Structure formats: C-alpha cells, structure tokens
Amino acid sequence: MEGLCLNLDCSELPNSSWVNSSMENQNHSSNSTRDPLKRNEEVAKVEVTVLALILFLALAGNICVLLGIYINRHKHSRMYFFMKHLSIADLVVAIFQVLPQLIWDITFRFYAPDLVCRLVTYLQVVGMFASTYMLLLMSLDRCLAICQPLRSLHRRSDCVYVLFTWILSFLLSTPQTVIFSLTEVGNGVYDCRADFIQPWGPKAYITWITLAVYIIPVMILSVCYGLISYKIWQNIRLKTVCESNLRLSTSRRATLSRVSSVRLISKAKIRTVKMTFIIVLAYIVCWTPFFFVQMWSVWDPNPPKEASLFIIAMLLGSLNSCCNPWIYMLFTGHLFHDLLQSFLCCSARYLKTQQQGSDLSASRKSNSSTFVLSRKSSSQKSITQPSTA
C-alpha cells in the first residue's frame, strides 16, 4: 500500500525507514545509520507471502460472490444490488491496491514511468474510498429498512446513489496524482514517493484521509446501528407485549395476526442487519490499526520506528478486501450453494455433451466400418459367382 502510506516511505518498510520524502531533511540525523537503498529481505518475503494469500482470497471470494449473485433468482433485490457493488469495490482494492503492492514488494523499487506511478497510487485510494462508501450506503439502506419500513418498500434510485458513490470516490482520490511522483531516492535510483511542499502537508493530508475514509464513516455507521438497535429493541418489546396479551385477549385471532406481522418484520430483515453489522465490525478491526499508525506517525514528534508495527497495520488493512465475501457466504449460504449447483450442473451437462459426441462419433465409425465390410463382401460374392451366360 505504497499509495496509502502517505506520510511514510512504504517501499522501505522492511528496513524500518519510515520517514517521508518531504521530511527527510529534518529527520536526517535519525536515519543517518540506515542505508535507504537496502531492506530486510526476510521480512520482505513474509510480507510478499501474506499479500499473495490476501490477493488470492480476495479475488476468489469476490468473484464467487458476483457469480453467485448473477445466477441467483433474488439478484434484483436491493440488498444484493449493494452487495454486488461492494464486491466490485473490493475487487478494485484487490487488483489496484493489493496487487501493485505485491509487485512493489517483490521488485523493492518502482520500475515504471512517472505517469504509471501517479495512476497506481490514485487507483489504490479509489478502491479504499469506494469500498468504504459502498459499505456506508449499504448500512444506510438497512437503517431505512428497519427504522422506516414503509418508505423502504418503495424502490429508490439505487443506481443513482451507487453512481454518485463511485464518482465521489474518483474525485476524492485526485490529490494522489499531485502528491505522488517518481522521485530520485539515491544515486540513479528512483521510486514512487509522496512529496509535500509545505512541512505541514503530511499532517493535513493524513488527517483529511483519516477523516474522510475512517472517522466520519465510522461515526455515521455508529449512528445507523444505534438507531437499528433501538428499533429492534422496540420491536422485541412490542412482540413480548403482544404475546403476553395473547393469553388474556378475547380476540385471539386479531392479536395473533398482530404478533405474526411483528415477527415477520423482524425475521425478514434481521439477518441482513447482522450481516452488514459484521461487515462493519470487520472494517473497523482491519482499518483501525492502519489509521492509528498513520496519525501517530505525523502528529507525534517522536514517532515509532518499528517496521513490524507498520507492516502488520498495512497487512490488516489489505485483509479487509477478502473478509467481506466470506461474510456474505456465511450469512447467505445459498449463494455458494447455488453457485456450486450451477457449476455441477454445467459440468454434468458438459460431460454429457462430450459423452454424446463420443458415442455419436463411435456410432459413425461403426456404421462406416459395417458399410465397408458389406461392400467388400458383396464385391467378393460377385467375383466368385459363376456366370450364367
């Protein structure tokens, strides 16, 4: 996540060189004993291995979810619509954030033109914004579905909201193209690094990214799930009152109908609320260490220099892109089941077609051989038959 380590020289993580290119002069004394052109290869190998595993799980999981939604009969529901776009956002994170970081860790330096450097760091943050805001949109939808169910029954312009989320993600990521560039870090050695003109630049930008991607979304998510929890508590309380009145009511049928309707509202939506809550919890767990370390490194006059701390925080942030699809599978098991059934059905159909093709080919060969033998037999019979003339 070179493009995410805005204040740090992430390409030098393995050898604990954590000073931003714009801050090297004021911190030169603390780095004088380090060689910025070398790294700890053992730590780099571990990081490459973990990133490769995260990339595989993220690609496999999100592709399975998208295929499962495609073949599922409920794919036009609002929840599946948001799940689809959150999976697409996670794929963007995997392809344009985790994969470039993996290649970067393998090569150690950025071996590409300046334009590619700016584009890669830009797309790295696009995926992070899109994934966060798509999760926020999904949670707001669940909040409306629980707190205002009559309003949520009307089909809203979901495509407009999703399109706005993507456009906003692309726009908010544009500063990356200005901040990052191909910079000389040694004698003839170039790397893709951040460069701030003003000394307060890293603090301002890191704080802005943390607010836009983490703090403000988490605050909104907390309000959403606070309202959802309160509404569910009210729902359970009403259900309990109705069930107690059922024993005393003279109009048992009307009360039973009321109890059933309350239970229906709860059962229809509680599962999706649980799923989105677990996704939000995974997001907070994965990204909290990363943003904490980012803010610590720019606001503390004596930031930590331990490479392992920053590497773990970075890898945890990347891990979020492969968590979501497996959470989907856990709460909507029929997605995986439908995908597996479709795969088995297609495989059986393919094998059956192949078998029919081979049987037809064998039948044609058999008929051809029979025809040749009969022709040969008839010709021999005509030769051996005596002439009547």
Swiss-Prot record:
A Pfam entry, by short name: 7tm_1
Compartments where located: Cell membrane
Disulfide bridge positions per record: C117-C192
Alphabetically ordered keywords of this record: Cell membrane, Disulfide bond, G-protein coupled receptor, Glycoprotein, Membrane, Receptor, Transducer, Transmembrane, Transmembrane helix
Residues annotated as glycosylated: N15, N20, N27, N31
GO molecular function: oxytocin receptor activity; peptide binding; vasopressin receptor activity
Topological domains annotated Extracellular: 1-50, 109-119, 181-207, 297-308
Matches recorded under CDD domains: 7tmA_OT_R
SUPFAM superfamilies the record matches: Family A G protein-coupled receptor-like
Region annotated Disordered, chain positions: 360-389
Transmembrane feature ranges: 51-71, 88-108, 120-140, 160-180, 208-228, 276-296, 309-329
PROSITE patterns, per database record: G_PROTEIN_RECEP_F1_1 (PS00237), G_PROTEIN_RECEP_F1_2 (PS50262)
Membrane protein topology class: Multi-pass membrane protein
Tissue expression per record: Highly expressed in the bladder. Also expressed in kidney, brain and skeletal muscle.
Gene Ontology cellular component terms for the protein in this record: plasma membrane
GO aspect biological process, one term: cellular response to hormone stimulus
Record topological domains on the Cytoplasmic side: 72-87, 141-159, 229-275, 330-389
Entry's family note: Belongs to the G-protein coupled receptor 1 family. Vasopressin/oxytocin receptor subfamily.
Function: Binds to mesotocin and may play a role in the regulation of water and salt transport.
Protein name: Mesotocin receptor
Organism encoding this protein: Rhinella marina (Cane toad)
